[in-house]
Amino acid sequence: MLPHKCMEEHDYPGLRFTLIGTLDGLRQKVKIDISTGDAITPQAVEYRYPLMFEDRSLQIMSYNLETLLAEKLENIMYRGTSNTRMRDFYDIYMLTGKPGIAINDATLYRAFLATSNTRRTTEFIPQFASTLESVESNTEMQKIWNKFCNDNDYVLE
């Protein structure tokens, strides 16, 4: 396992670790990004990650849901139609469309402002609605989305 730089465009680049696990001949890659300097609004949350083959879980500190969504929204706002990260669109759709997932709108708003401020992209906020319209109507974005759907079986579920 070797770390690679990630988020190099930020003032506080992070590291990405790619782990490869094997079980009965099956190989699975797991990518873990570690970064510093992100605005977590209001704070990190404790997350228990249940292990698949043991009766225990790992405790990790993670972004709260609103900060996770804010980072994805900020990326969409900033990159607009040059965004090729379809996973962000999919994640937003899944996280906001599932019953039982509670999103605090006020916290999301504060997290979005904090993320935009940290990334120095607040100047793009007034045009965000028109950026979304451009993304939605852009034929190249639609082609990239269709390819993402075809390449990832889980999208169709």
Question: Can you say where each PLM-predicted feature lies in the sequence?
Answer:
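Structured mid-to-C-terminal alpha-helical surface segments
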Residues: 1-157
